[in-house]
Amino acid sequence: MNMNRKLKTLVAMLGAAGLGLVATQAQAQDKVKIGFITDMSSLYADVEGKNGALAIQMAIDDFGGKVLGKPIELLSADHQNKADIAASKAREWIDTQGLTLLFGGTQSGTALAMAEIAKEKKRVFFDSGAGSSALTNDQCSPYTVHYAYDTVALAKGTGSAVVKQGGKSWFFLTADYAFGAALEADTARVVKENGGTVVGSVKHPLNASDFSSFLLQAQNSKAQVLGLANAGGDLINSIKAAKEFGITKSMKLVGLLVFITDVHSLGLKNTEGLLLTTSWDWNLNDQTRAFGKKFFEKAKRMPTDIQAADYSATMNYLKAVQA
């Protein structure tokens, strides 16, 4: 789908959801306010965090800093990976700041909580960082736009490819919250549909400090593939531990959600041969390389696919409102 068609689709969607009122809201206020709530300080801070806010601000600046003649202001906050904090901040901004657009970042539990607030308050909610397919399936809303990727896409991209390459039997190491559960379930379904089997799984707490007991269970399963249904710091630490305990001698590691920042943290020695799916890469073509260079000049690192999605979603939203 080309960019013009995407923009037309977004404009139609905004109108269908009764969100043509966004333009009216923007005109009635002195500023158009965008609120961005994500993990700024914990295990997902590198994959989005402050540089996600930077990407959104870059889009605002590239758009000209105004929409419908009104200046655009970006608010940002750290949800600390807690759904109640995310929901409370979203409600506060809508009630006291006249927020026009709510932007949700990493961590599916927080995203689902913000989606409920957006639905209640009739505000557009963009999510580019959280992956749970619940956002577009059983907890979908006409006000939620799930941007960039979800667990269904990750499962189909990586799960089917690994099975076709001979990885028939799987064991999952899964983060114990909405995203991990969805990623395991969606990938398990794809594995089975392609003739593979799931021999077991084990859940670990979010931001776990010790993976040894979980990895021992995985090793004892005798599965060919260890599917990592986690992300960020948890993915990094589980891969390091798997290498340390020699898990990779008997099992193929499959990262079901891996970011460029994870690769940088782990180094090529730990990520060599790792299979993964990504929604975007800075080195894909001339356009992505140009954006990557511009982002690097400000952040001193290349953008993750989530940070690129933050930019893209903001730009498309502003174009839709202006239209």
Please give the residue ranges for each predicted region:
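Extracytoplasmic "Venus flytrap"
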Residues: 35-57, 77-84, 106-107, 173-181, ...
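Extracellular/periplasmic periplasmic-binding protein-like sensory domains
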Residues: 239-313, 321-322
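Immediate post-signal peptide segment of exported/extracytoplasmic ligand-binding proteins
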Residues: 26-37, 65-73, 163-168
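Gram-negative bacterial Sec-dependent N-terminal signal peptides
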Residues: 2-27
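Beta-alpha junction/loop-to-helix N-cap segments that form part of ligand/metal-binding clefts
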Residues: 47-52, 62, 66-138, 147, ...
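Periplasmic-binding protein-like
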Residues: 93, 97-106, 126-128, 169-174, ...
